[in-house]
Amino acid sequence: MKTILQIEDNFANRRLVERVLEPFAYRLLHASDGQSGIDTALQESPDLILLDMGLPDMDGQTLVSILRETPALAKVPIVALTAWPESIAGEMAIRYGCDGCITKPINVAEFGRQIEAYLAR
């Protein structure tokens, strides 16, 4: 079973991702801030990290840098979940070190397929 860590401070967004991914039988973990996201990632070794780029304690760029500089986590795919405009979201996510980007509000019909594609890499 694949493990996904969602680092997201907004409860409604966490619940939405949980509901959308439920049929896929992933093990879904949650962290509500950057530091607990790092701690959870180190303890659980997720197969994918879904990262809100606007966390209250740490900006997304800083968090991605920390994850990438941590040997045990450096190769874990990171997908930004962001409210940035779609026209710049992908470019900004890649510039910050993410493997990809999904814009909010998420397209429920596409989200599961997108996650499966990132996990298949």
For each feature predicted by the language model, list its residue ranges.
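Conserved acidic carboxylate
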Residues: 8
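Two-component/phosphorelay signaling modules centered on CheY-like receiver
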Residues: 11-29, 96
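C-terminal output helix
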Residues: 15, 106-115
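Active-site beta3 strand of CheY-like receiver
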Residues: 44-50, 55
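The feature encodes the CheY-like receiver
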Residues: 56, 74, 86
